[in-house]
Regions:
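Short, basic/glycine-rich phosphate-binding loops at helix/coil junctions
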Residues: 39-44, 74-77, 139-143, 173-175
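Short strand->helix junction
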Residues: 29, 46, 85-86, 183-184
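Auxiliary Fe-S-binding modules of radical SAM enzymes
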Residues: 1-17, 62, 71, 188-325
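Conserved AdoMet/S-adenosylmethionine-binding subsite of the radical SAM
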Residues: 88-227
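Conserved alpha-helical substructure of the radical SAM core
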Residues: 43-79, 94
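Canonical Radical SAM [4Fe-4S] cluster-binding loop centered on the CxxxCxxC motif
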Residues: 18-58
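Glycine-rich beta-strand-to-loop/alpha-helix junction loops that act as flexible
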Residues: 79-85, 113
Length: 325
């Protein structure tokens, strides 16, 4: 049983916000309108607002069809995201419609940094989804620039207006995410602005999170539990499950047989591919790849010794990432 593809289809991963989520990468590379300090996919290589079919619908849907054809773990939602901002892909609407045909009855979610919400074409395509998870980390212009590092000329005002317009157009579920960094966007001024904004936006849910994996830049540090509690109390209303912990992959796949060196080598390639997407702990990697933890530990030691992987500690946990990602 295959638990993770090496291409544009990845997971399923156990997401605190969505459940067992099968991911689709609409960019195929780190292409984004932002270069967030905390980005777990590494620094943005192509900072752009140019919308293009970066991954054409036919290619992505073909990969998904092939993935579905083989035995695979169950999943609860298909999530459009990837290594950058998925709304940059002009084929997004076609992709959502194609996923509906291939996975009837499974909800489709889209992750977005909200930067293109002012574009009516983007809003029209997003309206095809069942769930949209936009992020808004700060309504203070200085904090927005510092944390999200947008393209020059990006307008917080346009993003704010675009989100409010989208809320009126969209019949699905809107889950707003606010990610806090220590000393960066955890100010009282930001909290007051976010409080007023969420009252106006009326999302179905607000998720206040912080980094749970090493980010793209070393100055990004997780917000404290007290800060998270303060923001959650003001923005989230009633108590709800938090999404700040490391994601855990769905544990449906049996352990691989790692006896043969060829299989081990193949597993090594999958580990490198997975770590190129985001840093992960040994146990989350083992779970995602359906591999035994002892095998993974040995493999990670070997890859570290060869300079292909590096270990970083965050919040008492050791994360591995691909060198040069
Ligand atoms: S966190 Fe999201 S919005 Fe920020 S740089 Fe990474 S992919 Fe882009």
């Amino acid at each position: 049983m295959r638990a993770e593809s090496q291409g544009l289809v990845f997971g399923p991963v156990r997401s605190g916000r969505l459940g067992a989520s099968l991911g689709l990468d609409l960019l195929g590379a780190k292409i984004c309108t932002f270069d967030c300090l905390y980005c777990e996919a590494g620094a943005t290589r192509a900072l752009t607002a140019a919308r293009r079919p970066y991954v054409p619908a036919a290619r992505l849907l073909g990969e998904l069809a092939a993935w579905l054809f083989e035995p695979h773990p169950p999943f609860e939602v298909v999530t459009l995201g990837g290594m950058g901002e998925p709304t940059l892909n002009t084929d997004m609407g076609q992709i959502i419609e194609g996923v509906r045909e291939l996975c009837p009855g499974t909800p489709v979610a889209v992750l977005t940094n909200s930067s293109l919400m002012a574009d009516p074409d983007v809003r029209r395509d997003l309206c095809l989804a069942d769930m949209v998870l936009p992020s808004m980390d700060s309504l203070m212009p200085s904090e927005f620039l510092q944390v999200n590092r947008p393209l020059p000329g990006a307008s917080l005002m346009d993003i704010r207006r675009g989100l409010l317009t989208f809320r009126r157009q969209f019949a699905g579920k809107l889950f707003l995410e606010v990610l806090l960094l220590a000393g960066m966007n955890d100010s009282s001024e930001n909290l007051a602005r976010l409080e007023a904004f969420t009252a106006e936006l009326a999302p179905d849910r607000v998720d206040v999170t912080t980094m749970s994996r090493p980010g793209a830049y070393p100055q990004a540090l997780p917000a404290s539990p007290a800060t998270l509690a303060r923001f959650r109390e003001a923005l989230c209303g009633e108590a709800r499950p938090l999404a700040a912990g490391p994601e855990k992959s769905a544990q449906f796949a049996p352990p691989l047989d790692n006896e043969g060196s060829r299989r081990l080598e193949a597993l090594g390639m999958r580990v490198l591919d997975s770590l190129a997407r985001r840093p992960q702990t040994a146990s989350s990697l083992a779970s995602a790849l359906g591999a035994g933890e002892a095998d993974l530990a040995n493999l990670l030691d070997d890859l570290s010794a060869r300079g292909l992987v590096k270990a970083v500690t965050l919040g008492g946990e050791t994360f591995f990432s691909r060198v040069g990602r």
